[in-house]
Design a protein with these regions (language model features):
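Basic nucleic-acid-binding interfaces
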Residues: 1-29, 34-67
């Protein structure tokens, strides 16, 4: 999955549940950026594999079916 698609779906999920969402592409090198959801943050790369998506959601404290 491409990062843009993942972030779009994650932003939609957060908005529907009233969670704060932010993405900052400046926090990271190359194709990496920082996504923050309700005070929890993690680094996201450009190309995401299914296992990496599950890890990101776990780090953000979100359920596996969030996106």
């Amino acid at each position: 999955m491409q990062r843009d698609v993942f972030l779009r779906n994650l932003k939609r999920y957060c908005k529907a549940r009233g969670l704060a969402f932010d993405f900052d592409p400046r926090h990271g090198k190359g194709g990496h950026g920082r996504v923050t959801v309700d005070g929890k943050f993690t680094t996201v790369q450009t190309e995401l594999k299914p296992l990496h998506i599950q890890t990101i959601l776990k780090q953000l404290g979100l359920p596996k079916d969030a996106v």
